[in-house]
């Protein structure tokens, strides 16, 4: 690494960005069961199991309310076809609440397969690192003391922007994982709503929202792949321009590309919901 402070400051900011981007790539290929050593998952599974008892109680409640609202009289309940329909609904809902964890993990694995297919098709095993062009390093190192004073301000502002954007992006990806845990933990309660016809929309909305959270990973991967292609073709540097202008134009274009990626990651949930009509 160069001994120049300006170059070091910019390179450190880019290293932070690259490390966070690599961390995102690693997180998106992980399962909730193995995330952070699996300790969080064990607690979530215990909470899920504890809430199953409440889910069974709500299942009976939703079932009774559904029967009362959908049947005009007790005579309708005694009809074989109607009684069979009610029994099948109750049995299916009981199975969904009992095996809700397996159902949700199966859905997650299916969508994770979509993410893996996108990675393999694009030929990306990891993200492309963003590096400082040699032209800028040489130009900055050739600067005198007074010429480098404006560069300090430019690199401080640019480095701060890049660092803040990297943390905003990684927080969004961690937020997705936390939502996966939240959905998994409370799953027995909304899934029990399938027992009654009037309340079944609660369960449908829950499963749609969970699928949308899972699909966010595929959108983030696509955004990272597009950014990596941008990073492989760095901004054009004009060697005849002043050093401050050269560095400022490079940082400005780089931050713009980063803003596009951060915006895509931050709005991945909204994009998925618009695609799925949620």
How would you label these PLM feature ranges?
Residues 94-186, 220, 224-277:
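Non-cytosolic segments of integral membrane proteins
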Residues 44-52, 84-88, 92, 141, ...:
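Alpha-helical membrane-interface segments at transmembrane helix boundaries
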Residues 1-10, 80-100, 203-213:
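Alpha-helical transmembrane segments and their helix-start/interface "positive-inside/aromatic belt" motifs
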Residues 191-208, 240, 271-275:
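Alpha-helical transmembrane segments
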Residues 1-58:
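Binding/recognition "hotspot" determinant
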Residues 53-65, 157-163, 180:
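Hydrophobic alpha-helical transmembrane segments
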Residues 58-94, 186-200:
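Hydrophobic transmembrane alpha-helix segments characteristic of membrane transport
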Residues 23-26, 82-89, 109, 116, ...:
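Short amphipathic alpha-helical coupling elements at transmembrane boundaries
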């Amino acid at each position: 690494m160069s001994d120049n402070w300006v170059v070091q400051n910019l390179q450190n900011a880019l290293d932070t960005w690259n490390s966070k981007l690599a961390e995102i790539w690693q997180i998106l290929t992980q399962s909730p069961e193995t995330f952070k050593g699996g300790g969080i998952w064990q607690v979530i599974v215990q909470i899920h199991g504890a809430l199953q008892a409440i889910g069974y109680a709500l299942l009976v409640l939703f079932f009774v309310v559904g029967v009362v609202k959908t049947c005009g009289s007790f005579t309708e309940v005694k009809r074989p076809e109607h009684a069979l329909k009610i029994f099948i609904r109750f049995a299916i809902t009981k199975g969904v609440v009992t095996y809700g964890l397996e159902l949700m993990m199966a859905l997650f694995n299916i969508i994770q397969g979509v993410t893996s297919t996108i990675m393999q098709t694009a030929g990306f095993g990891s993200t492309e690192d963003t590096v400082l062009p040699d032209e800028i390093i040489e130009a900055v190192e050739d600067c005198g003391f007074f010429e480098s004073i404006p560069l300090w301000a430019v690199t401080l502002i640019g480095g701060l922007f890049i660092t803040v954007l990297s943390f905003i992006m990684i927080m969004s990806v961690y937020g997705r994982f936390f939502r996966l845990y939240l959905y998994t933990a409370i799953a027995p309660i909304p899934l029990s709503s399938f027992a009654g016809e009037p309340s079944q929309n609660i369960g449908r909305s829950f499963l749609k929202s969970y699928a949308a959270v899972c699909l966010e990973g595929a959108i983030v991967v696509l955004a990272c792949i597009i950014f990596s292609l941008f990073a492989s073709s760095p901004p054009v540097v004009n060697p005849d321009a002043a050093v401050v202008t050269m560095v400022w134009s490079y940082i400005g274009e780089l931050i713009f590309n980063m803003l596009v990626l951060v915006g895509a990651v931050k709005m991945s949930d909204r994009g998925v919901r618009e695609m799925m009509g949620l």
